[in-house]
C-alpha cells in the first residue's frame, strides 16, 4: 500500500515538474473525536521521503480538529496560500466529502485517508474526479463480512453504527 501511495504521489508531482519543489498539503484530525486516527496519520507523515521524483518535497500538516468546517478552511488555505500540488486527508468521511467543491475550484487532487467509498463514487460526480483514496471501499469489506456470516449460518444480524457519513455508508452497504 505504501508503494502504491508513493507511486501516486510521484505521478502527481511529475505533472508539475517545472516546480523545484513538490508541496503536499495534509489535513488530519490530530485533535477532536477522530484524533485516534489522525494522530497515527500525522505520525506516519514524518516517515515520508524528502524527495519525490527527484524533486524536493515539502509537507504542510494542519489539524482540522475533527471539524468539517475547519477541514474546508484548511484546504482553502493550503490551496490558496501555500499553493499545494496535492492534498492528503482528511481522515474522516464528512470532512472528505465537504472539501470536494474546493478540489474542483482549485483543481487539486486529493488522496483521502477515509474508508468510505462515498468520497470517490460515483466517479465524475460532485468533485470526485479529483478524489482518490488509499483503502478499499466499504462494499468490498461488507461483502466479505456478509459472505463469512452466511458461511457460518447466521440468519439475523444487528447493526450498530455512528450517525455520521461513515456510519451511513456502512448502513447502505448492509441494507443493499
Residues covered by each model-derived region:
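Extracytoplasmic ligand/sensor domains, especially the bilobed periplasmic-binding protein
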Residues: 84-176
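Gram-negative bacterial Sec-dependent N-terminal signal peptides
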Residues: 1-19
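Glycine- and acidic-residue-enriched helix-capping/strand-helix junction motifs
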Residues: 32-43, 165-172
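Cleaved targeting-peptide boundary
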Residues: 19-27
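A generic secondary-structure signal
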Residues: 47-51, 77, 147-152
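Active-site pre-Tyr helix/loop in NAD(P)-dependent dehydrogenases
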Residues: 27-30, 116
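Beta-alpha junction/loop-to-helix N-cap segments that form part of ligand/metal-binding clefts
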Residues: 23, 36-43, 51-122
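Cofactor-binding loop segments of dinucleotide-utilizing enzymes, especially the Rossmann-like FAD-
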Residues: 29, 64, 162
Amino acid at each position: 500500500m505504501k508503494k502504491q501511495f508513493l507511486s501516486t504521489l510521484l505521478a502527481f508531482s511529475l505533472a508539475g515538474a517545472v516546480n523545484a519543489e513538490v508541496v503536499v498539503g495534509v489535513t488530519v484530525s490530530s485533535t477532536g473525536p477522530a484524533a485516534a486516527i489522525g494522530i497515527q496519520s500525522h505520525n506516519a507523515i514524518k516517515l515520508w521521503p524528502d524527495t519525490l521524483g527527484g524533486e524536493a518535497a515539502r509537507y504542510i500538516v494542519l489539524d482540522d480538529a475533527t471539524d468539517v468546517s475547519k477541514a474546508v478552511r484548511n484546504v482553502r488555505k493550503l490551496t490558496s496560500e501555500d499553493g499545494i500540488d496535492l492534498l492528503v486527508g482528511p481522515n474522516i468521511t464528512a470532512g472528505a466529502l465537504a472539501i470536494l467543491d474546493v478540489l474542483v475550484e482549485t483543481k487539486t487532487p486529493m488522496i483521502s485517508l477515509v474508508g468510505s467509498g462515498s468520497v470517490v463514487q460515483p466517479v465524475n460526480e460532485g468533485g470526485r474526479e479529483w478524489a482518490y483514496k488509499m483503502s478499499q471501499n466499504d462494499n468490498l469489506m461488507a461483502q466479505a463480512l456478509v459472505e463469512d456470516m452466511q458461511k457460518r449460518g447466521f440468519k439475523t444480524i444487528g447493526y450498530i453504527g455512528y450517525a455520521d457519513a461513515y456510519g451511513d455508508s456502512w448502513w447502505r452497504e448492509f441494507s443493499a
